[in-house]
């Protein structure tokens, strides 16, 4: 489905009911494209994807796994809410090589980059998770393939 998926990981498969469980727990609805990604690729390794938006370069090194990873969706949300730095309407989507996270907004699906050293100033990346995946799809770093 996505050419940026590099390698299938074992023991990370999830079911629709697990997605629904998390949606109910947080009172959110994942965008359809994100649900489809999780069902097919939860935890899979991806190519580094580098793209530029408004003269700022972004790199995507990993899509946050919904479950079963060291830095899974729920672990990140728990830490974010405990720390109180990330707005409650933002949920983790991906991260860059430096450990900074991309978040999607449940209110309008906009995607933002939040740098660890500047959490007060989210940087707008694109208007939807689908746009984010499109940016990744056409901007893979083929030098590391």
Regions from the PLM with identified roles:
Residues 105-108:
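Short acidic-glycine loop/turn motifs at beta-strand connectors
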Residues 116-120:
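Short, solvent-exposed aromatic-acidic interface loops
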Residues 100-103, 122:
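Short, well-ordered, mixed-charge alpha-helical segments that flank or form enzyme active sites
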Residues 1-100, 143-145:
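A surface-exposed partner-binding patch
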Residues 121-143:
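Compact, glycine/acidic-enriched structural inserts
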């Amino acid at each position: 489905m996505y050419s940026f998926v590099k390698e299938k990981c074992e023991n990370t498969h999830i079911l629709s009911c697990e997605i629904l469980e998390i949606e109910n727990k947080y009172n959110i609805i994942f965008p359809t494209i994100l649900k489809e990604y999780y069902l097919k690729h939860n935890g899979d390794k991806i190519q580094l994807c580098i793209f530029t938006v408004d003269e700022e370069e972004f790199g995507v090194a990993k899509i946050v796994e919904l479950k079963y990873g060291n830095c899974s969706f729920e672990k990140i949300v728990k830490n974010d809410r405990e720390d109180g730095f990330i707005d409650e309407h933002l949920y983790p989507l991906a991260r860059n090589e430096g450990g900074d996270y991309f978040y999607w907004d449940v209110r309008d699906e906009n995607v933002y980059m939040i740098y660890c050293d500047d959490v007060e100033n989210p940087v707008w990346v694109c208007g939807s998770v689908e746009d984010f995946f499109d940016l990744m799809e056409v901007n893979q770093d083929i030098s590391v393939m």
